[in-house]
Amino acid sequence: MSRPGGSTGVLTDRQVDIIATRLAERVSGKPADRPAPRPPVAATTSAPRRAPTSAPREALGDGVFATVDDAVDAAATAFHELDGMSLEGRQKIIASIRESMFENAEELARLAHAETGLGRVEDKIVKNRLVTRKTSGTEVLTPQAVTGDSGLTLTEYAPYGVIGAITPTTNPTSTIICNTIAMVSAGNSIVFNVHPNARECSMANVRLIHQAITRAGGPANLVTAVATPTIESAQELMSHKGVRLLAVTGGSGVVRQAMTSGKRAICAGPGNPPVVVDTTADLDHAARNIIAGASFDNNIVCVDEKEVIAVDSIADELVQRMGHHGARVLNERELHKVTNVIFTEYPGRRQRATLEKDLIGKNASEILARAGIASHGDPRLLVVRVSNGHPLVWTEQMMPILPITTAPDVERAIELAKEAEHGFGHSAGMYSRDIDALSRMARTINTSIFTKNGPFFA
């Protein structure tokens, strides 16, 4: 798929206006005012569009509210209406949401990329369509019955009510779609406080969902959002008496605040997912799939592979095969140049470095250009051999740069992977034909997601 906006991969302001106008027309059902031509501006690939500091009055409606109180009150009313509907009615709502989100997956992806400047449009389209199709719906709400000498016990699922959801700038639209389908299927309503740097695409997403719900006969404002999201509005949502459950996707700070809010919280925080490759692995299969996973959306997805620990004896061949499958393998001199531009603070061995935020989620070619390294074509991933203690191994870099380090045997590789994962319990994986080794690593690292012989997004 060709990338929008020419060789830089970033949409112009004019293109953003066209996409936003098209989405507004779909939501309202009538033509929107076409944007006036803008004077030409210098192209840039590093500075994302700034989110507005206030929402104009015409931006409200279709689930978008000026205050947290208004959004929660409206969602509470909608929840009670939904609670009175049949499960069949809820199924129609979810079907309508899926249809709308699949139809608008591409435009939402382009709008998210244009606003945030992160990742790749083609991968964001995949994410939007994947969560639209695969997120569980009402079909999983199966009652469980247990009968015995003492009688019959029937267990049925019940909704919480109003859920407060906080979403990231890395995966703004796909997170909203996933949360909505899962939470509404379970009978809840939602108030979103989105990341300020992804406000425009997120508001467009909420409006489309609102339209899909009401079109299917569902209650208005079942899914709402705060028009001008801030840190303060997120804190207000977390402490609001009308919110019974929090669902937070973000960094360690916002996750920590949610976990200490006094409310029940479901949180997805930071990770540093390692992948181990041992001597029994199919190296060509491993190389191809590690590249696919680590390069996906320029590595901004929290489950993407962040470092490889390979057993010494197969490391050279693994790196060679990665090069054959399209990765750009950096030499020692190029590694030095790249680390000088991607890190603003370089603390030393086995320490997490501070990232250059302007390069998070950027294409590999842009990182190479910033480092003064010639690039041919558009490599999806940079691969580099490093020592065990290199900061790339210990830092969740969220860039298409994959460090490969080594261990003398599979046991030490698993131990190093556990250390590099920092105990987050997020994601990890392994390539091996040794069932015992696969099971041993899964038990040892004990992450929420453990992938065997495949990319982590599988």
Can you say where each PLM-predicted feature lies in the sequence?
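N-terminal Rossmann-like NAD(P)+-binding subdomain of aldehyde/semialdehyde dehydrogenases
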Residues: M1-L154, A182, H324
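C-terminal segments
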Residues: R3-G6, L11-E25, G29, T138, ...
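Flexible, glycine/charged-enriched surface loops at secondary-structure junctions
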Residues: G84-G89, P219-V223, N298-C302, R328-T339, ...
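Conserved C-terminal structural/oligomerization subdomain of aldehyde/semialdehyde dehydrogenase
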Residues: I373-A458
